[in-house]
Amino acid sequence: MGIDINHKHDRVARRTAPKSENPYLRLLSKLYAFLARRTGEKFNAIVLKRLRMSRRNRQPLSLAKLARAVQKAGNENKTVVTLSTVTDDARLYTVPKISVAALHVTEGARARILAAGGEIITLDQLALKSPKGENTVFLQGPRSAREAEKHFGPAPGVPHSHTKPYVRSKGRKFERARGRRASRAYKN
């Protein structure tokens, strides 16, 4: 008698539409679903996948990161594409001329990009400008930059773990002695 195969892990969950009720986001999703199907380009498939992602996975992107990407050799006249919010960066002294296609651009970032002679286009305008993703640079924000991510990983207290413990206080008596110094039992 055979053993039934366990199908517990067979299903891979993929979003078929954005979770958001935003009608503009849903229309963009439909547009890029069409483009991904008809062009067969990987660029459009990636845009579609990211349009359907949760906000938590579409982290904001600073103007400084955009500037760094544009200043790389060969990227001067390319359009920077990001499926998130572009935010201003006060540490950036001068903004180069940038062409950006993004879901949202903050007021400060928008003013600085336009003042530098750059352009900001929407993703439906990008679909008309480069339907196959030609002359574009893809960027995304750091997904693991959230404070909550610091608590994920090997358990705090095990050797070589840099995981942040959940503690009620950061005082002397709280996860500071035992296991942290040789004079108190052991040191990991």
Curated annotation (Swiss-Prot):
Residue spans of biased composition, Basic residues class: 161-171, 178-188
BP-aspect Gene Ontology terms: translation
A Pfam family reported for this protein in Swiss-Prot or TrEMBL: Ribosomal_L18
GO terms assigned for molecular function: RNA binding; structural constituent of ribosome
GO cellular component labels: cytosolic large ribosomal subunit
Compartment(s) where it occurs, according to its Swiss-Prot or TrEMBL record: Cytoplasm
UniProtKB keywords: Cytoplasm, Ribonucleoprotein, Ribosomal protein
Protein name stated in the entry: Large ribosomal subunit protein eL18
Organism name: Caenorhabditis elegans
Organism phylogeny: Eukaryota, Metazoa, Ecdysozoa, Nematoda, Chromadorea
Gene expressing this chain: rpl-18
